[in-house]
Amino acid sequence: MSSQDTLTIAGKSYQSRLLVGTGKYKDFAETRAALDASGAQIVTVAIRRTNLGQNPGEPNLLDYVPPSRFTMLPNTAGCYTADDAVRTLRLARELLDGHDLVKLEVLGDPTNLFPNMPETLKAAKTLVDEGFKVMVYCTDDPIQCRMLEDIGVVAIMPLASLIGSGMGILNPWNLRLILDQSKLPVIVDAGLGTPSDAAVAMEMGCAAVLMNTAISGAKDPILMASAMKKGVEAGREAFLAGRVPRKLYSGVPSSPTEGLISTAK
């Protein structure tokens, strides 16, 4: 793939279109090994669950995943109100020396981790007003995605299916509507389970995919990280190449019919 085909978010370009979470691995060493295998440059971190220095004496993720090597994307996993999400990302900015690229997620239900969109919209407005560059986990409702875009976020991140479900893209038609209307990067977030899921998202024209459980929950997370990298790259190349149109009857044989050698005796 051309080095000029880059993912651009908030004015910064990246070669990798696979964003990876840092949770649920057996330890930080495995986290780093999976990140290296995935080729990811942007890694997302749950501020409420991961030590970035706020707990001295405990293992610090930044010792294994340094900001000099990776772009950190602090997220608000575990937040159920706009106020909690905003406070969490203010803390992240302090811990990461003014870092302002963040992932907003405000959850509505602990059993399915579906986003609470009224609270998400409220938090997004506050964070944008405070100078954050906000990437947003959201539903696949095209209208609410447009509202987020109007607020001034830098990326739309609709779910493919429920977080951690591994069910893949359940509603490709809504995702298609979002892709057609959006002027921002659309990054599929949540629910992907296999490299083929990632490839489908990229073939549709998504700018990138983000995943955590699909890699960390695999029997061999390092091998799965490598597989996901290949799936994303294959899907992106297929999108750029332009697939053959679907049609019931081709009408034209794929092999030439002129100049055939006669079998008549």
Swiss-Prot record:
State the InterPro entries in the record. Answer: Aldolase_TIM (IPR013785), Thiazole_synthase_ThiG (IPR033983), ThiG (IPR008867)
Name its species.
Bordetella avium (strain 197N)
What's the stated role of this polypeptide? Catalyzes the rearrangement of 1-deoxy-D-xylulose 5-phosphate (DXP) to produce the thiazole phosphate moiety of thiamine. Sulfur is provided by the thiocarboxylate moiety of the carrier protein ThiS. In vitro, sulfur can be provided by H(2)S.
Tell me if Transferase is a UniProt keyword of this record: yes
Query: Which Gene3D superfamilies does UniProt cross-reference here?
Result: Aldolase class I (3.20.20.70)
Query: Which family does the entry's similarity section mention?
Result: Belongs to the ThiG family.
Q: What is this protein called?
A: Thiazole synthase
What's a GO biological-process term for it? thiamine diphosphate biosynthetic process
